């Protein structure tokens, strides 16, 4: 089947239409390509196909620096120019707001701002995670492929911080060596690096039980020279694993990053944006939207380890910060101490069940990919907040929630700003500014 790719989807595929009008999601193609494709799924309203030959390459198709583009799932847009990536992400957000949020095109044109981004196309990630697999009887490490059931073994990744070119290869080599004489029980391996603090942490995720601590720490220290080596022990069913303990094997036992006006120290299980410069764009947009004053009260929902809590605490009289994940709560308390901030009430628990009793002048919410529960929107509306910033990592749930906010009626949308935190992928962050009517 000959197809011309019209656009990029919110996913790895290009979008085309067959002669019969059906939408076709095409693996291995980018917008502007003309390809020969083989149909792998023919549904009632759409088809899926994979590229067998590129008949005429798109002017936006590039030769990526990574040989695993199209094989590994980590950089699914790696063969598309950055300019085209930015345009596609902005367009995907716009179309999602129209399709799911039911916003009129003219509303979208008025609200959506030009996409913000850093200059770094590659080498921007401060964290990389590897999955174990067995190759020829030996444990090897890799990443989920385009086919998520497969692991693509790698010992380098151009997305990882380029100031640490040997870190990934050294860790992979050390663990491959150790696996020859020890059953490490590895479930995954995380590596975090900071070009600002020079911190390098290796986190080994394993079940509870016996573990060759001294050998692992010695071999990893000799190979990669990390500032921290930790073991994260988890238990429970595979789809509901939870952290039971973090054990320091060597070094500091945590990872440190300088961001915005302060410093954050994070334990291995805690979430932190993988693009530090991109996270600073988010902070700037949130502070610009809220314009917090020194006599005001702020609420930070789903606050994590303090990405927005810390800058709010420097600007406001008092902050109530709510977070359900235990390791992040502990990290937030430690980060407040490190930054000498004592005007924050840290509330451990679900954002709806533990919604702060205090009122708010400004409020920021940064929920997980699932977005906000309707109850959360009602609770936010019940405050006296003059301005609200909503940080989202999923355009679909964002569009759904924005529709709910508009229908609820307390707040009006001011602007919606996409942010490219993840070059070479289809993912996009968004910062939304609401103002009380």
Question: Could you say what each language-model-derived stretch is?
Answer:
Residues 190-194, 198-210:
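Carbohydrate-binding surface patches
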Residues 1-68, 98, 148, 345-347, ...:
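Terminal RNA-binding accessory module
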Residues 38-42, 131-135, 192-196, 435-437:
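Short beta-strand micro-motifs enriched in acidic
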Residues 113-120, 187-192, 417-422:
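Short, solvent-exposed loop/turn elements at beta->coil junctions and helix N-caps
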Residues 126, 200, 295-296:
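Nucleotide donor/acceptor-binding cores
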């Amino acid at each position: 089947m000959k197809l011309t790719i019209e656009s990029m989807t919110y996913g790895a595929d290009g979008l085309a239409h067959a002669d019969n009008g059906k939408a076709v999601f095409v693996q291995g193609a980018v917008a502007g390509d003309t390809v020969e494709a083989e149909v792998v799924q023919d549904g009632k309203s759409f088809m899926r196909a994979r590229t067998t030959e590129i008949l005429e390459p798109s002017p936006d198709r590039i030769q990526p620096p990574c040989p695993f583009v199209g094989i590994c799932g980590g950089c699914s847009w790696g063969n598309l120019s950055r300019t085209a990536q930015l345009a596609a992400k902005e367009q995907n957000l716009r179309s999602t707001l129209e399709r799911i949020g039911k916003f009129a095109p003219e509303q979208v044109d008025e609200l959506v701002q030009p996409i913000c981004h850093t200059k770094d196309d590659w080498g921007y990630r401060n964290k990389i995670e590897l999955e174990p697999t067995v190759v020829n009887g030996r444990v090897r490490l890799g990443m989920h492929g385009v086919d998520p059931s497969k692991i693509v073994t790698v010992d380098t990744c151009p997305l990882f911080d380029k100031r640490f070119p040997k870190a990934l290869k050294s860790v992979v080599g050390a663990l491959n060596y150790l696996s020859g004489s020890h059953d490490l029980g590895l479930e995954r391996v995380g590596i975090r690096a900071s070009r600002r603090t020079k911190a390098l942490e290796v986190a080994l995720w394993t079940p509870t039980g016996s573990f060759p601590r001294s050998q692992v720490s010695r071999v990893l220290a000799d190979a990669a020279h990390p500032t921290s080596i930790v073991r994260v022990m988890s238990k429970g069913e595979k789809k509901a694993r939870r952290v039971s303990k973090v054990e320091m094997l060597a070094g500091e036992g945590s990872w440190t990053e300088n961001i915005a006006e302060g410093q954050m120290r994070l334990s291995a299980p805690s979430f932190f944006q993988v693009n530090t410069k991109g996270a600073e764009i988010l902070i700037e947009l949130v502070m610009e939207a809220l314009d917090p004053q020194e006599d005001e009260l702020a609420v930070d929902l789903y606050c994590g380890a303090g990405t927005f809590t810390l800058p709010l605490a420097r600007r406001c009289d008092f902050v109530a910060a709510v977070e359900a994940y235990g390791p992040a709560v502990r990290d937030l308390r430690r980060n407040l101490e490190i930054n000498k901030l004592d005007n924050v009430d840290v509330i451990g628990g679900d954002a709806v069940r533990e919604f702060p009793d205090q009122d708010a002048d400004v409020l920021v919410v940064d929920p997980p990919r699932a977005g906000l529960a309707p109850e959360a929107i009602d609770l936010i509306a019940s405050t006296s907040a003059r301005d609200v910033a909503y940080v989202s990592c999923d355009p679909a749930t964002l569009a759904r929630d924005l529709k709910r906010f508009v229908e609820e009626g307390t707040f009006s949308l001011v602007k919606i700003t996409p942010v490219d935190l993840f070059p070479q992928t289809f993912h996009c962050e968004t910062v939304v500014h609401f103002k009380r009517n």
